[in-house]
Amino acid sequence: MTIPEDLRYTKDHEWMKLLDDGTALVGITDFAQSELGDIVFVELKADGTTLKTHESFGTVEAVKTVADLFAPVAGEIVASNPELASAEVVNQDPYNAWLIKMKVANPAEVEALLDAAAYRQLIGE
């Protein structure tokens, strides 16, 4: 199971990468995509949507289930990944197939998320 060291993680199995411009990429972890199975569709809220921490920003639909996606921190969606038209990219490379890019309201919130070691412990690795 791949768990990159340079990302932050949530207990809901989302990852977040803070960028230099104050925005962040958000996606689902390798663990999440493997638990979901074959992802067939991703539905996300529109660009410009303001999110509270832990608020749903969309869903991922797999062959046997639908799972909510939760904002790791508060902020505003500024973009969604155009590659998600082919939802299987999330299974193939979950850490490059980001779901949304968001403007983070409080960068300190990102630091409060789990680091790679804590996430490994959470999933029993």
Curated annotation (Swiss-Prot):
Its cofactor is (R)-lipoate. It comes from the Bacteria. One of its GO terms (biological process) is glycine decarboxylation via glycine cleavage system. InterPro entries: 2-oxoA_DH_lipoyl-BS, Biotin_lipoyl, GCV_H, GCV_H/Fam206, GCV_H_sub, Single_hybrid_motif. Disulfide bonds: none annotated. The keyword ATP-binding does not apply. The modification N6-lipoyllysine is found at residue 64. Keywords: Lipoyl. The glycine cleavage system is composed of four proteins: P, T, L and H. Belongs to the GcvH family. This is Glycine cleavage system H protein.
